[in-house]
A protein has these predicted regions:
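Compact soluble domain cores
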Residues: 5-71
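Short, compact, well-ordered microdomains
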Residues: 63-100
Length: 100
Protein backbone atom coordinates (compact mmCIF):
# COMPACT_ATOMS: atom_id res chain seq x y z
CA UNK A 1 0.00 0.00 0.00
CA UNK A 2 1.25 3.46 -0.88
CA UNK A 3 1.89 5.69 2.10
CA UNK A 4 0.63 9.28 1.68
CA UNK A 5 4.18 10.62 1.66
CA UNK A 6 5.41 8.27 -1.06
CA UNK A 7 6.34 9.83 -4.37
CA UNK A 8 4.90 7.71 -7.16
CA UNK A 9 7.84 8.55 -9.41
CA UNK A 10 10.54 7.03 -7.20
CA UNK A 11 13.22 5.26 -9.23
CA UNK A 12 14.16 1.88 -7.76
CA UNK A 13 17.78 1.22 -6.94
CA UNK A 14 19.84 -1.92 -7.41
CA UNK A 15 19.58 -4.58 -4.73
CA UNK A 16 21.10 -7.97 -4.04
CA UNK A 17 19.18 -11.24 -4.03
CA UNK A 18 21.11 -13.01 -1.28
CA UNK A 19 20.73 -16.79 -1.37
CA UNK A 20 18.32 -17.88 -4.10
CA UNK A 21 15.96 -20.68 -3.07
CA UNK A 22 12.87 -22.35 -4.48
CA UNK A 23 10.11 -24.16 -2.64
CA UNK A 24 9.41 -27.86 -3.01
CA UNK A 25 6.27 -27.06 -4.98
CA UNK A 26 8.16 -25.00 -7.55
CA UNK A 27 10.93 -27.60 -7.67
CA UNK A 28 8.43 -30.37 -8.43
CA UNK A 29 6.61 -28.21 -10.99
CA UNK A 30 9.83 -27.42 -12.87
CA UNK A 31 10.94 -31.08 -12.94
CA UNK A 32 14.56 -30.02 -13.43
CA UNK A 33 13.87 -27.21 -15.92
CA UNK A 34 15.36 -24.50 -13.68
CA UNK A 35 16.31 -22.38 -16.69
CA UNK A 36 12.63 -21.49 -17.01
CA UNK A 37 13.10 -19.28 -13.93
CA UNK A 38 15.93 -17.19 -15.37
CA UNK A 39 13.74 -14.66 -17.24
CA UNK A 40 11.68 -14.00 -14.08
CA UNK A 41 14.75 -13.71 -11.88
CA UNK A 42 16.26 -11.30 -14.40
CA UNK A 43 13.10 -9.18 -14.41
CA UNK A 44 13.00 -9.14 -10.59
CA UNK A 45 16.63 -8.08 -10.19
CA UNK A 46 16.06 -5.37 -12.83
CA UNK A 47 13.08 -3.97 -10.89
CA UNK A 48 10.41 -5.19 -13.32
CA UNK A 49 7.85 -6.36 -10.76
CA UNK A 50 5.73 -8.30 -13.24
CA UNK A 51 1.99 -8.73 -12.81
CA UNK A 52 1.39 -6.58 -9.75
CA UNK A 53 -0.73 -3.51 -9.15
CA UNK A 54 0.61 0.01 -9.63
CA UNK A 55 0.48 0.48 -5.86
CA UNK A 56 2.53 -2.68 -5.25
CA UNK A 57 5.07 -1.62 -7.89
CA UNK A 58 5.51 1.77 -6.21
CA UNK A 59 5.87 0.08 -2.82
CA UNK A 60 8.53 -2.23 -4.28
CA UNK A 61 10.37 0.76 -5.74
CA UNK A 62 10.39 2.37 -2.29
CA UNK A 63 11.40 -0.94 -0.69
CA UNK A 64 14.64 -0.88 -2.68
CA UNK A 65 15.52 2.37 -0.88
CA UNK A 66 14.16 1.56 2.57
CA UNK A 67 15.39 -2.00 3.01
CA UNK A 68 11.91 -3.52 2.95
CA UNK A 69 10.71 -6.80 1.47
CA UNK A 70 10.27 -6.88 -2.32
CA UNK A 71 7.56 -9.04 -3.90
CA UNK A 72 7.12 -9.58 -7.63
CA UNK A 73 4.63 -11.75 -9.49
CA UNK A 74 4.97 -13.54 -12.82
CA UNK A 75 3.30 -16.28 -14.81
CA UNK A 76 5.06 -19.51 -15.77
CA UNK A 77 3.27 -22.10 -17.87
CA UNK A 78 -0.10 -20.78 -16.74
CA UNK A 79 0.84 -20.71 -13.04
CA UNK A 80 1.41 -17.62 -10.91
CA UNK A 81 4.89 -17.49 -9.37
CA UNK A 82 6.04 -15.07 -6.69
CA UNK A 83 9.61 -13.95 -6.10
CA UNK A 84 10.21 -12.48 -2.66
CA UNK A 85 13.46 -10.82 -1.59
CA UNK A 86 13.62 -10.36 2.17
CA UNK A 87 14.13 -6.97 3.79
CA UNK A 88 17.74 -7.71 4.75
CA UNK A 89 18.52 -9.08 1.25
CA UNK A 90 19.72 -12.35 2.80
CA UNK A 91 17.47 -14.59 0.72
CA UNK A 92 15.19 -14.52 -2.30
CA UNK A 93 12.51 -17.20 -2.47
CA UNK A 94 10.64 -18.38 -5.55
CA UNK A 95 7.27 -19.87 -4.64
CA UNK A 96 3.65 -20.37 -5.58
CA UNK A 97 1.26 -18.00 -3.79
CA UNK A 98 -0.42 -20.93 -2.03
CA UNK A 99 2.94 -21.81 -0.45
CA UNK A 100 3.25 -18.42 1.23
Amino acid sequence: MIKPSQDENITPKAFTLGALVITRGVDAFLDGNYGALFPMINRHINCDWGDCSKEDAISNNWATHRGERIISSYELQGEKIWIITEWDRSVTTILFPYEY
